[in-house]
Amino acid sequence: MSDMKKVTLVLSDGTKFHGKSFGYDAPVAGEVVFNTAMMGYPESLTDPSYAGQLMTLTFPLVGNYGVPPFTFEENGLPTFMESDKIYASAIIVNDYSEQYSHWNAVESLADWLKREKVPGITGIDTRELTKVLREHGVMMGKILFDDEPDNIPEANYEGVNFVDQVSCKEIIRYNEGAGKKVVLVDCGVKANIIRCLINRGVEVIRVPWNYDYTDMDFDGLFLANGPGDPDMCEDAVNIIRKQISQSRKPICGICMGNQLLSKAAGATIYKLKYGHRSHNQPVRMVGTNNCYITSQNHGYAVDAKTLGNDWEELFVNMNDGSNEGIRHKVNPWFSSQFHPEACSGPVDTEFMFDKFVETLKSVSYTHLTLPTIL
């Protein structure tokens, strides 16, 4: 790939990093974030939560195991990806591996990016870039080609509802007739979340983020992950409030789902300085010494001090003390800021799905006693 074009990553504070293009040759602007995971770039790139972001990978070697095929299971879910396309606006790496080797790979990362028209740049000192973002916070940035004029505006995400952009537009059903019915609010759901529910023998009814499901026939509510600012999702919050005011049906949330449930519980949300995007975030279950290693991808957090009196923290981040989950003190409503479905990452907390489905099948709803795996 000696014909790679020279590019410059320009941060909003003027800091510049020089590299070369190995993906689609087009300038792009977006929010520059970093992910410290050592693997999982196919899953991360197709995670709708990365919509609008220039994803920096701190692990130096990227692309050496190629890209798996875009095949689909009988239930319609992609076999190896988290959605049906790339959602990240670009990928930034230190050392792109042109040669790849993996039993399941069908193409290179470069070929995939070009086919989906997503820029990728290599030769960047990604650890130095990460230090800049760590000290100054995430910033907007642009990837510019050195031989072309800067003719794209800086990204401005104020007032942008990314959830509306990535959510489904109509109701989709999975595993029909399987048993208990779960309404899943699609804020940008990852495929493996749906798979984890299907594998536990429930029917999943996937609805758009702002769909009023309160009069539907279902047994439990699942609030999925998604990109951007949860304050843009007031319609979803109001529907959740309506649901919890009229029913004690079990509720579980993940990532954005944790934030939306918390907002419905009266809490406020704030933006983290540089977010949590990795496979090695330690969280502690409140009231215990149980610590779990989790996969995370979020830039906002719940201010637990603002939760209503009937709610309490369920998990806390061991690195910075931020909220990692909540639960109601009486009703079977709980959520996690981390991703128990992983994909990619550790599956230490997959018991969250077990507890949710177990609660669906219980005759009476009682205060949750979450199991441990230690």
Q: How does the language model describe each region?
A:
Residues 2-13, 17:
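Acidic, glycine-enriched active-site microenvironments
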Residues 290-331:
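Catalytic beta-strand/loop cores that center a nucleophilic Ser/Cys/Thr
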Residues 325-361:
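A glycine-centered loop/beta-turn motif at secondary-structure junctions
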Residues 15-17, 21-146:
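Feature captures the catalytic cores and cofactor-binding loops of soluble hydro-lyases/lyases
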Residues 218, 225-304, 345-355, 359-360:
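Cysteine-nucleophile active-site neighborhood
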Residues 181, 187-238, 242-243:
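Phosphate-binding active sites in nucleotide-utilizing proteins
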Residues 366-372:
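Conserved small/polar residues in nucleotide/adenosyl-binding loops
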Residues 133, 138-181:
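Flexible inter-domain linker/hinge segments
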